[in-house]
């Protein structure tokens, strides 16, 4: 029980800021050694971590959480090994810190350059996924940043086990353990307090649902990177290959339906509906998918003896995070684009077509962080993009957009080198 939330947060902030000064001076070699030590520590403590996660899973079932939520918080042996493997991927990435972005010699003799540097202290608020604890810590440390983590109460045991393993490795490398700090109390007022800790924290990244995003946008006095809500669309154009398109749709919907880059709505050109929808229903129904469709979609389903729900404005604006799919038949590509503009969260959209002009038009007119041609929305991921583990998927346009990798955790400073140069 924390007696004084304000003092607690001030202490976290001060310790993180102090730790960030040491991290900013680390060489690339030192950072690699640090991340290797973290991977080794997580491996050595894997059984304790999995046991802690089982406590969270058991509590979630007892509290009646949905299977989708339980899947999000689950850490089994394979997933934990995958998380640790991702650390090796980050180790192999080029360190952006210290990169000289540009340099010029001014007429007055001043050598002016722009150099990439750490942000300083990052606050990350997230829900359910314990792997985020490791992903964020590793990316922050790789870029010389300290981090304050606030996970969901559903994964508190998992997050404590993971963060302690990380902090132990940091200490073994002769660095401040408070380079990575976890808020261990589920008290929601601590979230509001963290959002106002602008004296110490340089950026807030919320990873969670609409309520969390809204809370951060409304209360933060620190720059906030919003995103992570994925209302994702695929449009099957009149010139699409139906069989191949259905394979892509199935992958986008079924492979892992509980994540933000999973497909939520399919838009189908009217000329393909009678042929494509029966095949789509057959494929996805066999994999447990249920449907919400427009009137034309329902009419086709009725002919097949398939009962589906009626789509509404509310359902088209739904991030399903489950084996549920919205379907709408559209007259043309511009109607599809109009639907996406209305309902999309700006995360990931795609067009399925063999028409190069249609794909170019779609790319230019759809304003989302990731736009695909003949590919699954499931690719919107830091690992898939070659960024290593990601901090978040930003749906904003300033500072970072799409999967946020290492560079998104840096800023730059101007450096002027003179010969006791004065301004004339």
Swiss-Prot record:
Principal localisation:
cytoplasm
Where, subcellularly, is it found?
A: Cytoplasm
Q: Which GO terms describe its biological process?
A: L-proline biosynthetic process
> What pathway is it annotated to?
Amino-acid biosynthesis; L-proline biosynthesis; L-glutamate 5-semialdehyde from L-glutamate: step 2/2
Q: Which InterPro entries match?
A: Ald_DH/histidinol_DH, Ald_DH_C, Ald_DH_N, Aldehyde_DH_dom, G-glutamylP_reductase_CS, Glu-5-SA_DH, GPR_dom
Entry's Gene Ontology molecular function annotations:
glutamate-5-semialdehyde dehydrogenase activity; NADP binding
Q: Which UniProt keywords apply?
A: Amino-acid biosynthesis, Cytoplasm, NADP, Oxidoreductase, Proline biosynthesis
First-level EC class: oxidoreductase
What SUPFAM superfamilies does this protein map onto?
ALDH-like
Name the reaction it catalyses.
L-glutamate 5-semialdehyde + phosphate + NADP(+) = L-glutamyl 5-phosphate + NADPH + H(+)
Q: What is its EC number?
A: 1.2.1.41
The family assignment reads: Belongs to the gamma-glutamyl phosphate reductase family.
User: What's this chain's function?
Assistant: Catalyzes the NADPH-dependent reduction of L-glutamate 5-phosphate into L-glutamate 5-semialdehyde and phosphate. The product spontaneously undergoes cyclization to form 1-pyrroline-5-carboxylate.
| NCBIfam families the UniProt entry points to | PRK00197.1, proA
> Which named protein is this?
Gamma-glutamyl phosphate reductase
Query: What organism does this protein naturally occur in?
Result: Shewanella woodyi (strain ATCC 51908 / MS32)
């Amino acid at each position: 029980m924390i007696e004084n939330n304000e003092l607690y947060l001030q202490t976290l902030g001060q310790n993180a800021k102090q730790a960030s000064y040491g991290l900013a001076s680390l060489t690339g070699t030192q950072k690699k050694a640090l991340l290797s030590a973290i991977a080794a520590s997580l491996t050595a403590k894997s059984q304790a971590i999995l046991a802690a996660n089982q406590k969270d899973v058991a509590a979630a079932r007892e509290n009646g959480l949905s299977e989708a939520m339980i899947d999000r918080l689950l850490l089994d042996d394979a997933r934990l090994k995958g998380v640790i493997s991702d650390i090796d991927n980050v180790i192999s990435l080029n360190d952006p810190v210290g990169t000289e972005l540009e340099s010029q010699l001014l007429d007055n003799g001043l050598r002016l350059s722009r150099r990439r540097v750490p942000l300083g202290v990052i606050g990350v608020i997230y829900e359910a996924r314990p792997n985020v604890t490791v992903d964020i810590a590793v990316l922050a440390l790789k870029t010389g940043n300290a981090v304050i983590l606030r996970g969901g109460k559903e994964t508190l045991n998992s997050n404590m086990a993971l963060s302690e393993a990380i902090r132990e490795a940091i200490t073994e490398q002769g660095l401040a353990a408070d380079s990575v700090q976890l808020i261990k109390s589920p008290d929601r007022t601590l979230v509001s307090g963290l959002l106002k800790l602008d004296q110490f924290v340089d950026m807030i990244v919320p990873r969670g649902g609409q309520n969390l995003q809204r809370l951060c946008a409304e209360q933060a006095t620190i720059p906030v990177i919003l995103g992570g809500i994925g209302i994702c669309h695929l449009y099957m154009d009149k010139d699409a290959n139906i069989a191949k398109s259905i394979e892509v749709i199935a992958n986008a919907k079924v492979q892992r339906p509980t994540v933000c880059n999973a497909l939520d709505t399919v838009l189908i050109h009217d000329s393909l509906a009678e042929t494509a929808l029966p095949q789509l229903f057959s494929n996805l129904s066999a994999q447990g998918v249920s449907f919400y469709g427009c009137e034309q979609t329902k009419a086709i389903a009725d002919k097949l003896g398939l009962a589906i729900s009626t789509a509404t404005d509310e359902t088209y604006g739904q991030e399903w995070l489950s084996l549920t799919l919205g379907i709408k038949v559209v007259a043309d590509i511009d109607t599809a684009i109009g639907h996406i503009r209305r309902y999309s969260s700006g995360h990931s959209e795609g067009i399925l077509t063999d028409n190069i002009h249609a794909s170019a038009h779609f790319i230019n007119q759809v304003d989302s962080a990731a736009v695909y041609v003949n590919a699954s929305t499931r690719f919107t991921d830091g690992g898939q993009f070659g960024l290593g583990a990601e901090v978040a998927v930003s749906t904003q346009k300033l500072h970072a957009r799409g999967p946020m990798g290492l560079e998104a955790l840096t800023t730059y400073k101007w450096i002027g080198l003179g010969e006791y140069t004065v301004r004339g």
